[in-house]
Amino acid sequence: MVPQKRSRDDLNGLKSPVRSPKKIAMPAATSASNGVVAGWHSTIEKVVKSVVSIQFAQVASFDCESAVVSEATGFVVDTEMGIIMTNRHVVGAGPFCGYAVFDNHEECELVPIYRDPVHDFGFLKFDPSKIKYMNVQKLRLCPEKAQVGTEIRVVGNDNGEKLSILSGFISRLDRNAPDYGDLTYNDFNTEYIQAAASASGGSSGSPVVDIDGDAIALQAGGSTDASTDFFLPLNRGKRALECILRGDKVTRGTIQTHWMLKPFDECRRLGLSASNEKKQRELFPSTIGMLVAETVLPEGPSAVAATEGDILLSVNSTPISSFITLDSILDEAVGDIVKVTVERNGAEITFDIYVQDLHSITPDRYVEVCGASFQDLSYQLARIYAIPVRGVYVSEVGGSFRLDGQGNESKGWVVDSIDDIDTPDLDTFIKVIAAIPDGRRVSIRYRHLRDLHTTNFTITYIDRKWHSSFRLAVRNDTTGKWDFTDLSKQYPVPKKDEIVPQRATFTDPNLEEADAACAPLSRSFVRVSCMIPYKIDGFPRTMRQSHGLVVDAEKGLVLVSRSIIPYDLCNVSVTFAESVVVPGTVVFMHPLQNYAILQYDPKLVHADIETAKLSSTPLKQGDPVLFMGHNLSLRLVTTRTKVSDVTAITIPPNAGEPYYRALNLDAITVDSTIPNGCTAGVLADPKTGVVRAFWLSCMGERTEGRQHEYRLGIDTSTFLETVQRIRAGKPPQERFLDVEIASVSMIQARIRGVSPEWIAAVEQDNSQRHQLFEVIRTATPINGNSQALKEGDILLSINGKLLTTLTTLSEAGDKEQVTIKLVRNKKEEEIQAPTTDSAFETSQAVFWCGAVLQTPHHAVRQQIKKIHSGVYVSSRAQGSPAYQYLIAPTNFITHVNGTATPDLETFLSVVTKIPDNTYVKLRIVTFDNVAFACSMKMNYHYFPTAEIKKEGNEWVGYSYKDGKRVKESDENVEEQVNEAEKQE
């Protein structure tokens, strides 16, 4: 598996030097005889026929593993049943999809049949009859042949290469399991074998073979800072394979105690008596230490008897010198009582301990609800943090459960209660969440495993509109898949008019007497929260919040930044006085100038909300204003300041993935640093309290993992007409020139061919700023026609009006066609340029094999010269076929199986006829115009085809079953309503 190299590899995080006993003579590779070389040659010829490359996806985050696509190695251990051995961290604890590629490049689907709860091995199954052109060989498992000094070969897919053969010598047999860190899978209670073979990512699961071609260990991990590799002994893997071949259950026992192999000198310091040390050394002369209890889990079988620091002497009167012996006893004693003898502080103590079934504390199910997934807390995670094996663990945050606000942690959360009801286990959690109606706001109490001392509380919105899936996934070891059970029928019957009007009171700002006219503005601010269920239009966030300005309290109209409301496929809530929350809807989104208008139901809020008065007079440099806004702590701040500049700005586009940005905008900046710490606010006339500008945040480019945002003011004259039209019940119907322009100084204009007469006219028209504008970027038209304007054009006038301000450009854009005078290639021309209707926001998204597809949105057309297809990849899910087969965001899918797909409807008509678990050929063109072909395997079980489409003002969902389009209706809800009516 590619990410298998870790830096932490010892219990204390330090690197242990590779030392061989002095009595062992390590032969140099250059001194090998011709016979040895020939022996290795024939060995490798045999071994490679059993080694496979595993291309796999862990399709859902579960337990310690996140959803991931990777590659690893495995080797055949049984040719009749078709069993391949590999690592447990490859098979994974959760859903697995993968295939094996044999040495002759034949391919075969893999099905997981066993993953060990603790140790790093697992088994996959393939159909031997599918391999037609190769005589598949199996490797014998011979763990007893692993000895210090044994020359070995690691045969696998090192660094993702098809076949690599690495050589080395075993240097240690008694190493503790490597420590890979917290919140991730770790092996424990086993010895590891150490060697220096310099293996890297992709070699996980490789067989470690001796010169006889026998597998003596399993490659598992290594150190990133050295050439040291860690191999898992095959003793327990061999026993598990024998159970599987016999058709028996692989029993695994535990007493919930983590043991560590500690050297005798350390054991003496922990209380080991001289007599017991002598006895141990006589019984096991080759051992260097004893097993010591490192962690005893609370509420586990050992909790009442064992304690940390206990030195293990025997189990059921059998002296213990290794983990292998301990595992053997416990695995055969599941459900029984064992007698454990330890030495504690120099005294021998014997106690009885119940042996628990290890599989019973290894989760094999999870529930998906409200966009997140949950499971029972696992033994793996409980051991790391020494806590009881109980509780509800969040496998994947998302939707209504975005618990990553604390330090941006995406995993490691444990939910203690929902709606003030404790959730000690998954079954209780399902009952509690099923009883909560859609749209209800409930409290959540939760903690993070890294900081269990801190209890967190939050209020969440239960969203089943966008995240309607409520299903239980249970592992099926017969089929290798996870079976889904729909739980949505457990939802309560929806109630109408559940939102009750509530009262809120605003706090008064502490203003000087001279600014008292601005005090009512504090009651014009509301907090706007936007939860984004699906990533479309390239927008990089899933949740945004800031403040908006109430521009009509009677109609419930709120002005807000488009960096908060990127599109209307979202859940919007409006909060008044940090007391009352009501839903909001998107009424209008300006295509260029970074503002949107929302609407809420005024009947739901009883508060003294003020309609902000908007000025029609543009601000000028030097005008005195009062800034009022909310900082990042949601506190209202005010300051007197002056307008320092009003200038046309150019916000850089995001090079990696286009998303909405403000264009052709006059930015207002002020002589104060306080507004820069606020994402929203107003610039008001201190004497009258009239709003002169709206302060907002603009989404900028993303560089080196950092998202840039620009905070500035936009003049009220920019949006006043739009607000007035919406107030009057008229649609805004904004039209605009679909180009990006930037200011040009007079010296640039002269050099590029602007005549002295035009320059004189500019200087007379705009006394504050002598400027013209040039076209720096043209958007690719929706209809495929060519643009009338070209990059480099210097615009002189629009419809006969001199163009020295961006306000003139906005006013002229309302017409379907405008007359423009310009300078092109030093020649003055007059052209007719069509304008673009703003009603082109994304109205359809298709979910296919983990990819989110849509029509190329406006930001794409602004940055690309040619639209290759109407099927644009907006995002993709981790662990999905789209991710596995390298279908990346910003790609265009132009053909499917040779059929052109110019739009989403054609695409759907083609792909819905393709059977599950078959390959499809795609022609793809990248954003940089590079075309390539690729294949992708369908996986409808975990990634079914679906569609969401805007019909009128509502988004409607569709699913595809057997190639037929089915509208997602509330069938389950209707059944419940009918049943409730019958009962009444």
Curated annotation (Swiss-Prot):
Catalytic residues of the enzyme: H89, D120, S203
SUPFAM superfamilies for this protein: PDZ domain-like, Trypsin-like serine proteases
GO BP terms in the entry: apoptotic process; positive regulation of apoptotic process; proteolysis
Domain of life: Eukaryota
Protein name as catalogued: Pro-apoptotic serine protease NMA111
One cellular component (GO) term of this entry: nucleus
Keywords recorded for this protein, A-Z: Apoptosis, Hydrolase, Nucleus, Protease, Repeat, Serine protease
Subcellular location: Nucleus
Domain PDZ per the UniProt entry, residue ranges: 268-346, 756-826
Free-text function comment from the UniProt entry: Nuclear serine protease which mediates apoptosis.
Organism name: Yarrowia lipolytica (strain CLIB 122 / E 150)
